[in-house]
């Protein structure tokens, strides 16, 4: 997956050229038009799209995207503050809207206790990066 701040279509072509089969789109930095355009480009390249959001104000963009896989970022990109169960709280607030979606909890997943809480509440997909990089094996 190309996990980047994608703001231009050339980045999608570049991701495909480098072997990515999925791209991450961040709703807070893209317009509805850009989201639709980038989803279309990804589909034409046989790539999946993970569309993420943090703020509830972005919900209409998410639901209008017609994607089945939705990421809820536990990190507020404006403040960089991380709330480990934000994704669970948002999913629960809008459970009916997300009934047909696979939810990916993103960021702030730093322990098996956090993962266990998500699993026991039906969220089984995670995007984990920083905590793996900081872990010593």
Residue ranges and their predicted role:
Residues 18-19, 41-43, 67-70, 88-89, ...:
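Short, hinge-like loop/turn segments at secondary-structure boundaries
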Residues 7-19, 54-66, 96, 100-128:
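Catalytic cores of alpha/beta
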Residues 84-94, 119, 132-137:
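C-terminal helical cap(s) of enzyme catalytic domains, especially alpha/beta-barrels
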Residues 1-8, 21-32, 46-57, 70-81, ...:
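Catalytic beta/alpha-barrel core
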Residues 14-34, 71-80, 109, 121-137:
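Glycine-rich phosphate-binding active-site loops on the catalytic face of alpha/beta enzymes
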Residues 63-92:
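Glycine/Thr-rich beta-alpha phosphate-binding loop at enzyme active sites
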Residues 42-47, 99-101:
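Short acidic, glycine/proline-enriched helix-loop-strand junctions
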Residues 12, 35, 39, 59, ...:
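Generic structural signal for well-ordered alpha-helices
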């Amino acid at each position: 997956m190309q996990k980047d701040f994608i703001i231009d279509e050339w980045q999608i072509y570049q991701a495909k050229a480098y072997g990515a089969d999925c791209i991450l789109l961040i709703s807070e930095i893209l317009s509805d038009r850009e989201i639709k355009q980038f989803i279309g480009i990804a589909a034409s390249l046989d790539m999946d799209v993970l569309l993420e959001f943090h703020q509830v104000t972005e919900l209409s963009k998410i639901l209008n995207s017609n994607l089945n896989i939705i990421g809820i970022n536990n990190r507020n990109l404006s403040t960089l503050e991380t709330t480990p169960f934000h994704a669970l709280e948002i999913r629960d607030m809008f459970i009916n809207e997300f009934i047909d979606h696979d939810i990916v909890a993103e960021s702030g997943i730093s322990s098996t206790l956090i993962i266990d809480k998500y699993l026991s509440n039906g969220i089984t997909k995670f995007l984990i990066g920083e905590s793996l990089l900081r872990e010593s094996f």
